[in-house]
Amino acid sequence: MKTLIVILSFIFFSLNFTLNSQEISLHEQFNGRYDFTAIGNTLNLVENNSSTNCTILTGSSANLELEPTQNITAAYLYWAGSGAGDFSVNLNASIITPDRTFSFTYSSKLFFAGFKDVTQIVQSQGIGSYELTNLDEIDISEAYCSTGTNFAGWAIVVIYQDNNLPLNQVNVYDGLQAVPEAISIQLNNLNVVDVIGSKIGFIAWEGDSSLAVNESLKMNNVLLSNPPLNPETNAFNGTNSFTGESNLFNMDIDVYNIENTISTGDTSALIQLTSGQDLVMVNNIVTVLNSQLPDATII
């Protein structure tokens, strides 16, 4: 198989809406003995689709755990929420303003996300607790509360180097797109020499565990799942694959093993996301493929 096709399918609850967003594209590529992990947390006290309580916290924390052999190479902070935007937050003792911002409009309602390269902060602190605070400009008005679209959360994607790893190609993509827009990302000049350890991960906002109408994740027309966290019919359900959490209300930090859907010798990859009912905003995608490329050149 020379082309890798990933299809993320969701079902959207209305066909009468207006969508504006930024296309997901390659942000950075790492070639060598690299892998990734991710941490983060929601600010929602409950799933927004299951309660009339629209109160949202202004901060939350998560722990970064790494093995002694895993050395931090890069760290990227993403935060998002309902409303026009909050672009001044705190990560532990550091004031954070975004390097880039993203916006999305759905049925006249605004949503936002911010991105910050926090490599120096995370390299300096290392493992331990990270707390994002001062995310206090979230719109929880009736327009959002009554439609179950009020949310806020944050995540840090950490790329690390470990001499015990095989030679991998780690691609980090970002933007802010929501279903039902189709997303196509063509990856050329790949060199998959072994399928062991191949995986795809994503950070997505606003998914509901209670809305699961034909949600699916497919690769080469094969349904992927990570039971019990991510069943075939409910990919975006407020879970974290790294910690096993199932109460990450209205956000997902999920990873799927794709060893059985790719083959040694694959030279290109087409990642596609298509639409569904549950409002889901995809902010970040990470792929890990075994590769012999020796440097960090973007291809």
Which ranges hold each PLM region?
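Bacterial Sec-dependent N-terminal signal peptides
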Residues: M1-E23
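Disulfide-rich extracellular domains of secreted proteins
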Residues: S21-P294
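Surface-exposed, proline-enriched loop/turn segments that connect beta strands in immunoglobulin-like
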Residues: I298-I299
